């Protein structure tokens, strides 16, 4: 059930972030991603509270990404990790280039 929940969201979006809105790392990751202007339908924020039981979802995250914590961030079906991984990419000034290369950003 957790696999279906996650895979359905990954199939429909280029950038998907699984969050808990009470989590400060999730809010920080959203702040980074919200600096960019995404094409309609190319970015989805999924609150993991939508799925019960949450531990089953976290077990599935661990199975496919090696981590149970949120945020869990995917570009396409590829996990890029969590907040610290996103921050590292952003600090290298590579995030915009990566997002452009996968075709999720609006062009003026």
Swiss-Prot record:
Keywords: Disulfide bond, Electron transport, Redox-active center, Transport, Virion. It is found in: Virion. The keyword Transmembrane does not apply. InterPro entries: GLR_AS (IPR011767), GLRX1 (IPR047185), Glutaredoxin (IPR002109), Glutaredoxin_euk/vir (IPR011899), Glutaredoxin_subgr (IPR014025), Thioredoxin-like_sf (IPR036249). GO terms for cellular component: virion component. SUPFAM superfamilies: Thioredoxin-like. Induction: Expressed in the intermediate phase of the viral replicative cycle. It comes from the Viruses. One of its GO terms (molecular function) is glutathione disulfide oxidoreductase activity. It holds the Pfam family Glutaredoxin. Its main location: virion. Residues 3-106 form the Glutaredoxin domain. Disulfide bonds join 23-26. The keyword Transmembrane helix does not apply. Has thioltransferase and dehydroascorbate reductase activities. Belongs to the glutaredoxin family. This is Glutaredoxin-1. It comes from Cowpox virus (strain GRI-90 / Grishak) (CPV). The gene is OPG075.
